[in-house]
């Protein structure tokens, strides 16, 4: 991305040609103007300008609500059809009858799938920061199921309380009855739904780049601007990061479906570039989304599941805890809380809800809970900052349009 006057001089593609104002004919002037505007927007955050940030956030929310209301009004027939369908489903939901057992099962599965799809979307979209929901939610869930499966020698956990709470069934399995495939099958639905959510979250960069290419209008999106600059200076790229991005871009552009599938299947931080590349070169939607969905929801998720399940299998966990105790000086003191945590988890798995035994909280679980709260809180702050900066961008664009007409 251009950050100084020299780079601004090099970027002359797509600059506006205004005949009535000489300053707008100069590409370096426009590039410097965009850089200043971007720096001004980036300064609009809650910890620097709280009042302005909150004001802009509220105004952006109102504008978005208005825009969505207009869109829904233009599609009012579809909205009415959806409302009628929801009304019929609501009647079926509340009427007593033999169908209620089926209704409750469908409701439970739909809510469970929607929960993990939503977390996957949050992890992928992120609105500037990203909420790492695999580390915070799906990973710990798979780890808990793995530990419980080896402790109970079964995955037939009572429902309820599963999945809200895991306890061993009354009839536990035989020793060695648990296999890797058994645990994979137990967590397959939530893992695939989370992967599908991450695939859906990759669509915004694709649609943004596709719209910019079709309209021919220069976008102020920073990632897309960086992508365009990378294409302009592809022959002179020297640093490793740029060469890696160019490799991804060439793979996606030349190989197509299989290239997108490979990028989506392997955990890497450059997949956003694949979405921008596909949008920029007008790759068909189903080619991009189909490859992304298969890669993220099936291939990549099985890789991540295998890693977590193997890492938290019984013998691996015991070996890791014993290795912690080998650390000189601080080993025993570090090992003790991990041993206490594992012992508490084992007791909890055999704890029945009506026994009334109080459960003491381990400092590891306490620290993890606080970490989750902090990350969710920071994610909410990032949403507020991002929407406030979006409104600031609207103000700057309006101001620029007024200046051009003078």
Swiss-Prot record:
Its membrane topology: Multi-pass membrane protein
Predominant localisation class: endoplasmic reticulum
Keyword Cell membrane: yes
Catalyses which reaction(s): a 1,2-diacyl-sn-glycero-3-phospho-L-serine(in) = a 1,2-diacyl-sn-glycero-3-phospho-L-serine(out); cholesterol(in) = cholesterol(out); a 1,2-diacyl-sn-glycero-3-phosphocholine(in) = a 1,2-diacyl-sn-glycero-3-phosphocholine(out); a 1,2-diacyl-sn-glycero-3-phosphoethanolamine(in) = a 1,2-diacyl-sn-glycero-3-phosphoethanolamine(out)
One cellular component (GO) term of this entry: vacuolar membrane
Keyword field: Cell membrane, Endoplasmic reticulum, Lipid transport, Membrane, Transmembrane, Transmembrane helix, Transport, Vacuole
Keyword Endoplasmic reticulum among record annotations: yes
Compartments it resides in: Endoplasmic reticulum-Golgi intermediate compartment membrane; Cell membrane; Vacuole membrane; Endoplasmic reticulum membrane
Family listed: Belongs to the VMP1 family.
Protein name (record): Vacuole membrane protein 1
Source species of the chain: Xenopus laevis
């Amino acid at each position: 991305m251009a950050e100084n006057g020299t780079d601004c001089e090099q970027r002359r593609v797509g600059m506006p040609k205004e005949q009535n104002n000489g300053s707008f004919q100069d590409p370096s002037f426009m590039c410097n103007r965009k850089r200043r505007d971007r720096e001004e927007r980036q300064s609009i955050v809650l910890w620097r300008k709280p009042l302005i940030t909150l004001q802009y956030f509220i105004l952006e929310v109102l504008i978005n609500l208005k825009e969505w209301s207009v869109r829904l009004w233009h599609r009012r027939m579809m909205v009415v059809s959806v409302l009628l369908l929801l009304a019929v489903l609501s009647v079926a939901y509340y009427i007593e009858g033999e169908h209620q057992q089926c209704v409750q099962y469908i409701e439970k599965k739909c809510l469970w799938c929607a929960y993990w799809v939503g977390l996957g979307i949050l992890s992928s979209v992120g609105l500037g920061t990203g909420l790492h929901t695999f580390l915070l939610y799906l990973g710990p869930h798979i780890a808990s199921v793995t530990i419980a499966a080896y402790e109970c020698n079964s995955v037939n956990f009572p429902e309820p309380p599963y999945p809200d709470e895991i306890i061993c069934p009354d009839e536990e399995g035989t020793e060695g009855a648990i296999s890797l495939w058994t645990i994979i099958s137990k967590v397959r639905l939530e893992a695939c739904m989370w992967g599908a959510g991450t695939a859906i979250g990759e669509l915004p960069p694709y649609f943004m780049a596709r719209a910019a290419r079709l309209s021919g209008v220069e976008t102020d999106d920073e990632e897309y601007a960086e992508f365009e600059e990378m294409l302009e200076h592809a022959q002179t790229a020297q640093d490793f990061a740029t060469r890696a991005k160019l490799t991804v871009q060439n793979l996606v552009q030349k190989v197509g479906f299989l290239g997108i599938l490979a990028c989506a299947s392997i955990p890497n931080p450059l997949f956003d570039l694949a979405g921008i590349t596909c949008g920029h070169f007008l790759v068909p939607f189903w080619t991009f989304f189909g490859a992304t969905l298969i890669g993220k929801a099936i291939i990549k998720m099985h890789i991540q599941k295998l890693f977590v399940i193997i890492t938290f299998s019984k013998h691996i966990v015991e070996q890791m805890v014993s290795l912690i105790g080998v650390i000189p000086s601080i080993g025993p003191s570090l090992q003790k809380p991990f041993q206490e945590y594992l012992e508490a988890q084992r007791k909890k798995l055999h704890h029945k809800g009506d026994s009334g035994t109080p459960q003491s909280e381990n400092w590891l679980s306490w620290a993890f809970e606080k970490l989750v709260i902090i990350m969710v809180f920071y994610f909410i702050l990032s949403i507020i900052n991002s929407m406030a900066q979006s409104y600031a961008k609207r103000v700057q664009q309006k101001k620029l349009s007024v200046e051009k007409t003078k």
